[in-house]
């Protein structure tokens, strides 16, 4: 994604800040390693970037909204056939929550919703989160958009821009890949959501943590990374490769992407 999008994201965060006053058996102990970083200066999304599993088409980042909040999304629900939409205030309180059962189309289901909310202040920072889970109830994807909530006035909606693309792309690692040898090599490109550490993690379908790395990126530009995830399994094990970041406003994830694979000894 282009540098200009990064700069726009910075200006959005500055605007929002100025407008509000925030009232199995695991493997060896995971170790933090620095990423191999090669920032890109390309003016368009890098080859290989693809539409996100959760596309929040409306509202865009930095939108100023009154109640009801109009939400338009396209999301791949997965085996659960459910899409979870939550609106949070700047202190983490839940302002609105909707769960929709959808057909589960492989390319995603379209939803148009209205989320009612009430705030006591004239304005405050809000976070819209959309998530999906697998059939066992484990989070598999989550996307967030920061907006400004208004108690009255007129909504001003910004476009989604490059936010409709997935923040991560893995190189030479197809979905449902078979991995052997006790170590998964992961290379790709990632566009950070914020300045929080980025977690790359292997988790079995039973919910067991198998391996974890922590990556630190110096800025919010798209950047290349490379790491390895050692693991130990006694036989073929279905798992997911996760990459996620925590929200620096809410106490919880801001972004989650996962990909299915099978681990072999």
What are these regions (language model features)?
Residues 1-265:
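Intrinsically disordered, low-complexity Ser/Thr/Pro-rich tracts
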């Amino acid at each position: 994604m282009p540098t200009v999008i990064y700069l726009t994201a910075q200006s959005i965060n500055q605007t929002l800040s100025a407008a509000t006053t925030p009232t199995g058996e695991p493997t060896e102990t995971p170790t933090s390693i620095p990423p191999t970083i090669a920032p890109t200066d390309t003016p368009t999304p890098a080859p290989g970037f693809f539409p996100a599993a959760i596309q929040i088409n409306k509202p865009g980042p930095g939108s100023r909204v009154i109640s009801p909040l109009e939400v338009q999304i396209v999301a791949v629900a997965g085996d659960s056939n459910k899409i979870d939409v939550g609106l949070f205030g700047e202190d983490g309180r839940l302002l609105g929550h909707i769960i929709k059962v959808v057909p589960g189309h492989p390319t995603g289901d379209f939803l148009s919703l209205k989320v009612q909310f009430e705030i006591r202040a004239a304005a405050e920072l809000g976070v819209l989160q959309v998530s999906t889970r697998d059939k066992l109830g484990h989070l598999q994807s989550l996307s967030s958009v920061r907006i400004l909530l208004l108690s009255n006035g007129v909504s001003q909606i910004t476009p989604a821009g490059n936010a409709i693309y997935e923040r991560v792309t893995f190189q030479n690692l197809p979905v449902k890949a078979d991995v052997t040898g006790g170590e998964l090599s992961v290379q790709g490109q990632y566009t950070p959501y914020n300045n929080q550490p980025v977690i790359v993690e292997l988790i079995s379908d039973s919910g067991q943590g198998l391996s974890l790395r922590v990556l630190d990126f110096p800025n919010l530009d798209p950047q290349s990374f490379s790491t390895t995830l050692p693991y130990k399994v006694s036989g073929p094990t279905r798992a997911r490769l996760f990459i996620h970041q925590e929200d620096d406003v809410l106490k919880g994830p801001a972004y989650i992407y996962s990909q299915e694979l099978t681990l072999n000894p």
